[in-house]
């Protein structure tokens, strides 16, 4: 008795799957050692990975825009309008204000300082690291900044401790102390040419060509300083989304699979079973050619003709052959494949995970379908409070700590502005009882009126406008004025 055998033949397209032609080669690979430290991840790949994601770049743009997009501003480090403030200190603070305002406006002549800082923040969010070069003027004071592309930068080991001066304020007086600090070096390499930078604040002279510290050196060979903005406390920063890198690549593969589906047209996977017969050689070749020519919508609707040959039995008494009847069945395998809903669910979960790594609501990435005004305002305020305000504060504190002491500016500081969520109409309603009680002076309301009118209003110099209504003989009907202001705002909103 002969055993029955089953032969399986798989038909598939001969076309190779598309493969990336990019090479994430590290030009520093042969230079890593005791001096130049290797990063934990491939910097070039991290720099370009946002091009393969449908959500990562939106999250990075949200950070860059909301941290630096509202611009720099200057604020006093003390209450300049307090009655006990010394006039000499007040004048000194006003001069510092003008100097600092001119400083940040002239940090870069081609682009704004916010734009250069934004480039570094974008690098930091992509790779965990961002760099800026600091330029000094002839007097040795910081005078400008330049963007340093992170993919060309590497960090070197820390050197021996160096004695540096540190200026701080105590009881209203500036004091200076000496302390020991270890500085790092940074190296940039483009097309095989290396350029060294020293960490900002390093008082030593460094050769830009070799990275060696020297006592005397021509000015053109002296290395400039660099500021390293990083996420984390390591030698290199680590991007906040690095734990989701598998989801990022998985979502990309799902998108590529869908693209190939639409590119090649609708071709249902199927099993063709032939019973009591064999597929003819011609049918076999036709099936293989059909699979090879899958690509293109013009091949999406074709008729398939299958020819099978029955198996001949033994000859009968008259010499003829009895051919067994052939049964051909096509069984669809589409139902065992993952459906489109699973891909959509995977993509949505991947987007949510990446967005969660940045702690951003969908509103900040252009996905606001389920928001109304109340929920949108709540999402904006919570994100501003929990994410962007701390980021601005951390960043600007670093800049103030590094730059202002060398500029001899101590009474004012840089700030990064944020959005203004205040509604003048709501503020006017709240101020009503205070105005009626005589607790607000006209000058206290000039800033509010300026925001309503869209221009800056200076305070009135007369003393009468510096005191609340009702404390002077010449009373003004401030409550009526506020009522008119509220009505004007309502008319503007309804018009």
Swiss-Prot record:
Family annotation (InterPro entries): PBSX_Firmicutes, Phage/GTA_portal, Phage_portal_PBSX
UniProt cross-references to Pfam families, sorted A to Z: Phage_portal
Family: Belongs to the phage portal family. PBSX subfamily.
Protein's UniProt name: Phage-like element PBSX protein XkdE
Organism per entry: Bacillus subtilis (strain 168)
